[in-house]
Amino acid sequence: MQRIIFCEYEQRDTEGLDFVPYPGELGQKIFACIGKVGWAAWLVHQTMLINENRLSPRNPSHRAFLEEELNKFLFERRVAKPEGYIEPDA
């Protein structure tokens, strides 16, 4: 059964996630307030951040940086691109 939520990222009613995608309170907030399209957009952005900044998800300071960027991206609509980043051709 599909769950419809108001997505804070897309600013419209959309299909909600099927599962809590992140641990803790933040994961519950994402589950309640972010749709599938918004979460997919974050995963693409997160991959770019990891690759361009050479981050390791095993490093606690890198994880903290990614969590901060996740909050900015999904809930504050602020997107930071690494210095010198060039968008790939579509």
From Swiss-Prot:
Protein name: Probable Fe(2+)-trafficking protein
GO biological process per UniProt: cellular response to oxidative stress
Provenance organism: Xylella fastidiosa (strain 9a5c)
HAMAP family named among the record's database cross-references: Fe_traffic_YggX
Top-level taxon: Bacteria
Gene3D superfamilies: Fe(II) trafficking protein YggX
Pfam families: Iron_traffic
Lineage: Bacteria, Pseudomonadati, Pseudomonadota, Gammaproteobacteria, Lysobacterales
Record function comment: Could be a mediator in iron transactions between iron acquisition and iron-requiring processes, such as synthesis and/or repair of Fe-S clusters in biosynthetic enzymes.
